Amino acid sequence: MRTLRVADLEAKPGEKVSGFVHIIGAEFGIPVTLICGEKEGETVLISGGVHNAEYVGIQAAMQLADELDPKKIAGNIIVIRLMNRTGFEHRTMSLTYEDGKNLNRVFPGNPNGTLSDRIAYTVVTEFFPKADYYVDLHCGDGSVSYTHLTL
């Protein structure tokens, strides 16, 4: 029987499991949902919150994780609900709070680097090998001027 595993999280066919994947040297993990479809198929990795102030991507990732039914899915879906957790909690726009780095620019990361480097390293080593496809959700954030879009 095929089981979807990422770090310490595990979902069997027809199951949805949520939890946290630990970041090396951090006291927290990143929130993740594993959706293991009842039927065989490929695996899609979806991430929200690489840029912590891109709220639409974060909300979309959370809604997808909550609403998708594993009994109606062929293959697997891995959802990183919020990759840059501390940046989100401290409202630092698009940077990681602890090191001031743009998480999207440090991939593939470094297990001995700053928090941003270690988050990127965890995603590259724990998530990427499981995925056939990767969708990284982005949108405008607080630094975008919406005046030209307003009637």
Predicted segment positions?
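Structured catalytic-domain cores with a bias toward divalent-metal coordination
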Residues: M1-L151
